[in-house]
Amino acid sequence: MKALQEIYNLRKFNVNDLQSVMQINRSCLPENYTDFFFIDLYRRFPEAFIVAEENDQVVGYTMCRIEVGLSGLGLSGLVKKGHVVSVAVMPQHRRRGIGEALVTKAMEAMKLYNAKQCYLEVRISNDEAIGLYKKLGFEVTRTNHAYYADGEGAHVMTRKL
């Protein structure tokens, strides 16, 4: 099997990717965002908005933002932290390491913004994603019940950068 980088190209998002990313978001996730939301994150944190493409077609993405707040890992005071807002990979491209590569690249980008830790929310029923995030060093730091619009809860998963 060919190496991931030989099949898929990971690169920074650009505005020409917007429609493809929005389509992936709508196809893969129940949480959908407006075009303004995507563009706003891109403009504020361009290094942390990554797409995966195969043959010049976007097949996955992750977008993040940088926040200042209380540590989810017991550190005292306020810390700069990355927030993985959304990760999605088209179903026919899953289980090939794309999600792992996207999140890893996003974490590298968060360091460019001097983030010391990062976190994300994941549906408590999404065992596959939870397993991936644990593999990447995230740990469940709390659970928010009825977090999503449909009433499902979310695990907040956090890790140091």
Provide a role label for each language-model segment.
Residues 2-4, 8, 12-92, 103-113, ...:
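Acetyl-CoA-dependent GNAT
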Residues 10, 95, 121-122:
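Conserved SAM-binding loop
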Residues 38, 61, 93, 132, ...:
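Conserved hydrophobic/aromatic "anchor" residues
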Residues 56, 60, 97-99, 137:
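Conserved phosphate-binding and hydrolysis motifs of nucleotide-dependent enzymes
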Residues 64, 140-141:
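Short beta-strand "wing" residues that participate in macromolecule-binding interfaces
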Residues 91-108, 127, 131-135:
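Conserved acetyl-CoA-binding loop-helix of GNAT-fold acetyltransferases
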Residues 96, 113-116:
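Short coil/turn segments at alpha/beta junctions that flank glycine-rich nucleotide-binding fingerprints
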Residues 116-119, 123-127, 136, 142, ...:
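C-terminal "cap" of GNAT-fold acetyltransferases
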